[in-house]
């Protein structure tokens, strides 16, 4: 992370600022939704810079909670790119999906458009419109809004989601710190490799 030019101290400061009560509440909400038949969580972003962060979220939640025939399947969505393709299902499809939206309210580059609004403004308008449409359609949404994207907010999010994933594992009565499914395919691979 430091090699990429990020300030580690700010990342750790953000983690220390994490509201642990909110992280616990998020874990409880996820567990309650799971008990009601919501088996897929969409991590939805409107900022392309967050794309690999949502890939990490998929790994985090799948590995900590996807075991013993339990767990919520994490997927990632980049809006507005995915609005037309997945928006129809979210709005009117089977109610097995809930979403966690991570929206960056202010982005550093604020390019103006012919509509008198910046791209950042249009992204925020799209996020609000989708949230209202999903609310009207009965889609459950957790919305996390960040003022801006920087090392401190990323540190906050990392700790928030790591804590939530661990607590959520315990709520499901699974060990959030092992990966027996991953270990199994690795064992089979090594067996085949060593026998050739």
Task: Describe these PLM feature segments.
Residues 39-44, 71-72, 112-116, 142-147, ...:
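Glycine- and acidic
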Residues 75-150:
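Helicase-primase coupling helices
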Residues 1-99, 181-196:
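Active-site phosphate/pyrophosphate-binding segments
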Residues 63-68, 96-99, 120-125, 164-168:
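Short, surface-exposed linear patches
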Residues 22, 45, 103-111, 158, ...:
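Short flexible/disordered coil segments
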Residues 1-16, 121, 125, 132, ...:
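Short alpha-helices
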């Amino acid at each position: 992370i430091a090699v990429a030019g990020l300030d580690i101290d700010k990342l750790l400061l953000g983690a220390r600022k994490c509201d642990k009560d909110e992280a616990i509440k998020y874990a409880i909400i996820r567990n309650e939704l799971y008990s009601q038949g919501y088996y897929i969580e969409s991590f939805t972003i409107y900022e392309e810079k967050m794309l690999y962060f949502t890939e990490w979220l998929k790994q985090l939640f799948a590995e900590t909670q996807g075991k013993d025939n339990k767990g919520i399947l994490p997927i990632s969505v980049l809006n507005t790119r995915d609005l037309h393709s997945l928006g129809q299902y979210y709005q009117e499809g089977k109610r097995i999906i809930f979403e966690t939206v991570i929206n960056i309210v202010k982005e550093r580059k604020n390019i103006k458009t012919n509509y008198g609004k910046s791209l950042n403004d249009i992204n925020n308008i799209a996020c609000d419109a989708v949230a209202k449409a999903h609310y009207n359609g009965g889609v459950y949404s957790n919305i996390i809004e960040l003022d801006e994207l920087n090392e401190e907010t990323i540190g906050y999010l990392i700790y928030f989601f790591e804590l939530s994933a661990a607590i959520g594992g315990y709520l499901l009565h699974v060990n959030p710190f092992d990966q027996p499914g991953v270990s199994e395919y690795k064992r089979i691979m090594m067996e085949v490799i060593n026998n050739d």
